[in-house]
Amino acid sequence: MAATTGSIPKAQDLAHAIRFEGLSHRLAVNRKDGSVMVYVPAGDFEMGDGKEGDCPKHQVFVSAYWIGVYAVTKGQYLQFMQATKHRAPDNQVHREAGKVVHPVTDISWDDAVAYAKWAGGALPSEAQWEKAARGPAGLIYPWGNDWDASRCRHDKNKGSETTCPVSGYPGGVSGYGTYNQSGNVWEWCADWYGDDYYGKSPARDPRGPEGGSDRVTRGGSWRDDGPEYFRGAYRFGGEPGYRCGYRGFRLVRPASPSIPS
């Protein structure tokens, strides 16, 4: 992965056409698939909420990592399919002109894991996902502590397009520089889902229960309405084999012992 500090990776280094001007964070480009990654430093953050399913609030230490600024796109996933002969998503929208920079959907958890391994990364743990979404200030939403329907893609503003490009809604960028961690598509995480996991999870780099029936999904989507689903702490379980038009994913890569190449 090619690291950049205080500068923007050149467009020709990317495998897809996404606007990312204006980001001032420490960025890198994952060479395998062109994903723009942002560095999240090691440290504690308050995970969870007082609401049912998201409680209790608890301090978690998360080691440093890189996370995708954007969700993986249809164009990127098409490259993966061509390189590996992996099965296509359940729809063929990834082949439509103008859709290559929309998030890939209609993929299972195993599909997302296969892509991540091919790209040299992994799915984020739900702790990694939540820390990035809430930013250094630990906000309720990526942009602040108050719901603002204009800052993310949801049922009331989707129009006829359902998803939007992964660089859409710049007003909803998190404090770490990630786009659309509220709305557009739910995102697969690595962890099994457990309602009571927070009461017994480790305080350092939690990875979820050892087993379960559902995998964690985060973020809310274009088909959801109301502020609840879009909170950074909101957790939901999804059947790993279920493919739908409102679920995608983004990559993470470890920051140590060195930036991957």
Model-identified regions with their sequence ranges:
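Short small/polar-residue motifs
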Residues: 11-15, 33-35, 147-149
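Functional-site microenvironments in short loops/helix caps that host divalent-cation chemistry
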Residues: 46, 50-51, 87, 92-236, ...
